[in-house]
């Protein structure tokens, strides 16, 4: 058998290819960033052709770094930024428009239009999701309404829809020459077009949103052999697909109900495995697919999605020039003992879970002449922990299962100040695993299981280990006081943007 498994990790800011061995250790890695396109306030786009080019580049580079050939790979898995929405011409393979990124809010009027009859939760029982600009279905509707000729071509089957997983699989398996048009259940569950119960496209949702079924990919499991790569990586089975946050849950081996992880990246995404039945949320979370292995029952999850966390540190660096690199925010934050009474609500594109307020906008509140740059930096880090606290509290209310330990991954887990404050706010331990690349590892695990590289979930659990554990140190009175202050700040951010803006 081939010695390794590869994973394409296509994220919001970069594309990576990582090669893992049987113990889940990284053998080779390559990464390439792609452009972030901001054509107007609230608009965020990616060039899908650039993403495909960069994906091929990092695959070549990683194999070269490892001295490997495609034949050394038993399988390749794919994990991707979810919700980012693309349409392309089946015959030419060219996108009809830049991809609308998950953060893009240009469809907010469509959201409001559909919410007028039945409110934002009118489709929640069916799809698990509230009406929000975040999800793919109304991004796709916007493209069909605004790209000349797109709807007619889509109805004829000449225009295809996909999230980034679908785009990559289609190109990897031949593109215009017989490329496979598929998506897995985790990505499909983020479109608001799939029934959580049947795991199929829902005809009623398609009619309501005005989406031609002919343009949609086939829904498949998260772990099976879908097809093989074509040149220049010919013959490698593509055998795993997971949306990035579900991939992190899988890579963190959260296979039992009540086990939870939080990924600290551009945004924050907390998921809790809830088992074989979907748990409806009454506390502002979304109900989603955790994963589905080939031939097995699906596992469901509760998710709290937070739009801006690591991106707030980038904003501090790129827009305010308060720091030179992202790591410097911790140094600056530790120059002060606390936040000085300052709270930063990073509602740059509204607020996601648990508030779902499209009109919220960012604010810094509590400023006095006492406040300095250190307090601002600390408030930036604390905003991530406060938002995560809100989401984990909602998970406990919905599931009836309090989180006993939070498994953390993503770039921000290197920040000890943030992780300690997170443990303090949650009042439970926060754990960083030995293998940091949990998202890519989850995709590799899904692919490896499908081809027998790993025999079962127990093999994966044995690979997981603790790198560092943070335990709570804050007293309950202090925790309650600052949590209440944060809640007041959040309330003041609501509904700043109006239809006239």
Curated annotation (Swiss-Prot):
Q: PANTHER family recorded for this chain?
A: GLYCEROL KINASE, SUGAR KINASE
| SS bond list | none
Residues involved in ATP binding = 12-14, 266, 310, 314, 411
Q: In which residues is sn-glycerol 3-phosphate bound?
A: 12, 82-83, 134, 244
- Which catalytic reaction applies to this protein? glycerol + ATP = sn-glycerol 3-phosphate + ADP + H(+)
User: What residues does ADP bind to?
Assistant: 12, 16, 266, 310, 411, 415
Q: What is this protein called?
A: Glycerol kinase
Write down the EC number: 2.7.1.30
| Chain's role | Key enzyme in the regulation of glycerol uptake and metabolism. Catalyzes the phosphorylation of glycerol to yield sn-glycerol 3-phosphate.
Q: Which residues bind glycerol?
A: 82-83, 134, 244-245
- Pathway it belongs to? Polyol metabolism; glycerol degradation via glycerol kinase pathway; sn-glycerol 3-phosphate from glycerol: step 1/1
Q: Which Pfam families match?
A: FGGY_C, FGGY_N
Entry superkingdom: Bacteria
User: Is ATP-binding tagged as a keyword?
Assistant: yes
Of the GO CC terms on this record, one is: cytosol
- One GO BP annotation here? glycerol metabolic process
Q: What family is reported?
A: Belongs to the FGGY kinase family.
What UniProt keywords apply to this chain's record, in alphabetical order?
ATP-binding, Glycerol metabolism, Kinase, Nucleotide-binding, Transferase
What species was this sequence derived from? Methylobacterium radiotolerans (strain ATCC 27329 / DSM 1819 / JCM 2831 / NBRC 15690 / NCIMB 10815 / 0-1)
The UniProt GO MF terms for this protein read: ATP binding; glycerol kinase activity
Activity regulation info: Inhibited by fructose 1,6-bisphosphate (FBP).
């Amino acid at each position: 058998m081939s010695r390794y498994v590869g994973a394409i990790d296509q994220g919001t800011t970069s594309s990576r290819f990582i090669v893992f061995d049987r113990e889940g250790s990284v053998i080779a890695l390559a990464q390439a960033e792609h452009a972030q396109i901001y054509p107007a306030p609230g608009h965020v786009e990616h060039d899908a052709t650039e993403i495909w080019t960069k994906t091929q580049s990092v695959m070549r580079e990683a194999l070269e770094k490892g001295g490997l050939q495609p034949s050394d790979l038993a399988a390749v898995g794919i994990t991707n930024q979810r919700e980012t929405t693309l349409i392309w011409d089946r015959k030419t393979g060219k996108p009809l428009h830049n991809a609308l990124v998950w953060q893009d809010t240009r469809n907010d009027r469509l959201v409001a239009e559909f919410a007028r009859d039945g409110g934002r939760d009118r489709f929640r029982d069916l799809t698990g999701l509230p009406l929000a600009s975040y999800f793919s279905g109304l991004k796709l509707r916007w493209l069909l309404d605004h790209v000349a000729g797109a709807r007619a071509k889509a109805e004829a089957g000449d225009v295809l829809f996909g999230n980034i997983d679908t785009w990559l699989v289609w190109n990897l398996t031949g593109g215009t020459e017989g490329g496979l048009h598929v998506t897995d259940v985790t990505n499909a569950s983020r479109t608001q077009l799939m029934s959580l119960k049947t795991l199929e496209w829902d005809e009623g949702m398609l009619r309501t949103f005005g989406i031609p079924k002919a343009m949609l990919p086939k829904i498949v499991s998260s772990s099976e052999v879908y097809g093989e790569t074509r040149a220049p990586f010919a013959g490698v089975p593509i055998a795993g697909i997971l949306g990035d946050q579900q991939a992190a849950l899988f890579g963190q081996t959260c296979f039992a109900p009540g086990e939870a992880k939080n990924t600290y990246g551009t945004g924050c995404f907390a998921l809790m495995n809830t088992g074989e039945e979907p748990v409806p949320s009454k506390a502002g979370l979304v109900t989603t697919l955790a994963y589905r292995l080939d031939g097995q029952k699906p596992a469901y999850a509760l998710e709290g999605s937070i739009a801006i966390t690591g991106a707030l540190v980038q904003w501090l660096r790129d827009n305010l020039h308060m720091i030179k690199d992202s790591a410097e925010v911790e140094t600056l934050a530790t120059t002060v003992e606390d936040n000085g009474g300052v709270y930063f609500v990073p509602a740059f594109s509204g607020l996601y879970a648990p508030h779902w307020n499209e009109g919220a906008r960012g604010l810094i509140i509590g400023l006095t002449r006492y406040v300095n740059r250190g307090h601002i930096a600390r408030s930036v880090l604390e905003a991530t922990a406060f938002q995560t606290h809100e989401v984990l509290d909602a998970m406990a209310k919905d599931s009836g299962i309090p989180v006993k330990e939070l498994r953390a991954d993503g770039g921000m887990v290197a920040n000890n100040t943030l992780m300690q404050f997170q443990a303090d706010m949650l009042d439970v331990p926060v754990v960083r695993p030995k293998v940091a690349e949990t998202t890519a590892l989850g995709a590799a695990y899904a692919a490896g299981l499908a081809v027998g590289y790993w025999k079962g979930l127990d093999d994966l659990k044995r690979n997981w280990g603790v790198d560092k554990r943070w335990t709570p140190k804050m007293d309950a009175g202090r925790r309650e006081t600052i949590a209440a202050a944060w809640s007041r700040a959040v309330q003041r951010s609501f509904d700043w943007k109006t239809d006239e803006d």
